[in-house]
């Protein structure tokens, strides 16, 4: 057997295609549903972390103004009817409520981390309030 000279061939850069299994081939040959592309989804937690960073940077109020105002008026009705509020008073209340909630959630998160969890639970909020002396 005589040796022959081998010539260089252009490489495609990939592996040789493998034979498909019968079930895969049947699936691929089945008619597609109009070529509808699935919407892009991020991994669980990615969007949550992005929102956390965004809200930590921002300083604007996160509770909508009108629903908060309705809630304040509804609670005030239990104490005295026909109470009037200045818009600045409602704004000051909303600022303090949001500051309180942010602080409570920070303490709640510390309680969850102490319990070696990353998800806050009702018992974490209860513990945080108890440690603050707000609830006996």
UniProtKB/Swiss-Prot annotation:
Q: Which residues carry this modification: N6,N6-dimethyllysine?
A: 5, 15, 28, 37, 80
Residue span of the signal peptide, if any? none
- GO cellular component: a single term: nucleus
What are the N6-methyllysine sites (modified residues) in this protein?
A: 5, 10, 19, 24, 28, 37, 80
Entry-linked InterPro entries: Histone-fold (IPR009072), Histone_H2A/H2B/H3 (IPR007125), Histone_H3/CENP-A (IPR000164)
Annotated region (Disordered) at 1-43
Looking up CDD domains in the UniProt record yields: HFD_H3 (cd22911)
Top-level taxon of the source organism: Eukaryota
Q: Which residues carry this modification: Phosphoserine?
A: 11
Assembly behavior: The nucleosome is a histone octamer containing two molecules each of H2A, H2B, H3 and H4 assembled in one H3-H4 heterotetramer and two H2A-H2B heterodimers. The octamer wraps approximately 147 bp of DNA.
Spell out the protein name for this chain: Histone H3.1/H3.2
Q: Give the classification, highest ranks.
A: Eukaryota, Fungi, Dikarya, Ascomycota, Saccharomycotina
């Amino acid at each position: 057997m005589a040796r022959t000279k081998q010539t260089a061939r252009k490489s495609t850069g990939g592996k040789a295609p493998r034979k498909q299994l019968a079930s895969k081939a049947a699936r691929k040959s089945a008619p597609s549903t109009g070529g509808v592309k699935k919407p892009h989804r991020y991994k669980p937690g990615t969007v949550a972390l992005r929102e956390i960073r965004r809200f930590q940077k921002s300083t604007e109020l996160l509770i909508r103004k009108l629903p908060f105002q309705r809630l304040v008026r509804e609670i005030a009705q239990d104490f005295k009817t026909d109470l009037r509020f200045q818009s600045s008073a409602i704004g000051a209340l909303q600022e303090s409520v949001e500051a309180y909630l942010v602080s409570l959630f920070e303490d709640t998160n510390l309680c969850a981390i102490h319990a070696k969890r990353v998800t806050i639970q009702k018992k974490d909020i209860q513990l945080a309030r108890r440690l603050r002396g707000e609830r006996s």
